Amino acid sequence: MRVRIFDTTLRDGEQSPGVSLTPEQKLTIAKKLDELGVDVIEAGFPLVSDGERKAIKMIISENLSAEICGLARANKKDIDAAIDVGLKYIHTFIATSDIHLQYKLKLSRDEVLAKAIEAVEYGKSRGLQVEFSAEDATRSDREFLKKVFGEVAKAGADRIDIPDTVGYSTPQYMAEITKDAVEVTKLPVSVHCHNDFGLAVANAISGIQAGAQCAHVTINGIGERAGNASLEEFVMSLQCLQFGEKYETGIKTKLLYDTSRFVSKLVGMTVQPNKAIVGENAFGHESGIHTHGVLSNPLTYEPISPELVGRTRWLQVGKHAGIHGMNAMLEEYGLRPDKEQANQILDKVKNLGDQGKHVTEVELLTIASEVMKERGIKRIVQLTGFSVSTGIGTMPYAFVKLNIDGKEFSATDHGVGPVDASLNAIQKITGKISEVRIKDYGLASISGGSDALCEVTIKVEDAQGNIASAKSVGEDIVTTSVQAVIDGLNRIMLKKLLKEKKVGN
């Protein structure tokens, strides 16, 4: 069965508290979604603002492969606003639960039914494709909900949507009301699930199993309050889990991780490390038992291949690590400790872990070199001097001095802020000496307050396209950023050096 993917990242996703996108940003995300292969892009709510209308027009003008839809309340003013920006497809809604009727709309059930019918008829009379949505459907009286769906179907609706507006449904109940909608309307049915109880994806899948043909989803599950059903989790669950029926989507799954990171950066919402499919830890392993299993056969502790979603697996050496995982990491660099050496290295790593320290790849190699008496394994790049200057009315600049493999280099550069200036100065040195460039930079706050800890994540890339990532945590954003870049440079340059040494041997 082919399942239709209706992406509402640009509408419901943007309603996440604190998220606000420019028209240009919405356009770039729309292009990414189209490349990913979604069937429908809900581009926004035309009545909201001039910027929203501009964004929708820009997206429509791109002539993307995906259908472009816009939100409209069940009234002529909203529908006219959608028509004015050039939309041919609207998602129109009105609440049907008694709590919404009493406290928000101040309408009777008969009045709500009349408005729903009128909106659908008006939209169809203007030549629009109309998807009707009964807001708060899962808390609505079931018989009244069936009546509304039946009447809007008679009025000409093209599609019916069942929103679990406050994430109140269970998978079983979602299946029941989906069957109701399919039987009453004989129309294609969509499900729109929120994640207030962590059941959005499960409810969406249950709706599909019960006869729905489409799910409303967002990248990374962003959305109001606790968010919406996550596109990546929903798609991969349909594709990989055993449901007794084969489901297909048009999603290019190898682009999921890249799309997730792209959206995360633009909306300013960090993806939690343990998030399914796209979280940093989704294909990371530290435990010795798990690492040994994965090295023998990845399927022992991975339900899917990371490459299927544009990822790679990674191993972490820490207090829970085992000999097999550690040796596999060292083997990558041509280092083969004997049994006694391996145990010594692992003991040192575990001792650091017991002290609450995170052992980086470079630190592991340094420990290994000391135990194995290997020469030439060291931190290739060392920060020997660093200062920044910034202020109102002055251009921020930074001075950086690096020791690279025994040679001193220094540079100064400007930037839009002290962090940018510092990274530009480092880039000025490394671009000339080692052909390594800073590919990506991310910043997240770990704790609150003026003395909050920040976490900086960076990616660096060499001329051959090899990429290394590094993280640093600290109270000072500028210093932490510089340290993360230095760690990343050491990783990629040390990896290159040891691989050359391995080939030479």
Labelled PLM ranges:
Residues R2-V3, T9, M236, F243-T412, ...:
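A mid-to-C-terminal "edge-of-domain" accessory segment
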Residues Y397, D405-S434, K439-I446:
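Small-residue-enriched alpha-helical segments and adjacent helix-cap loops
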Residues N466-S469, V473-K502:
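Mixed-charge, glycine-accented linear interaction segment located at domain edges/termini
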Residues H192-I219:
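Small-aliphatic-rich amphipathic alpha-helix that forms the alpha element of a beta-alpha
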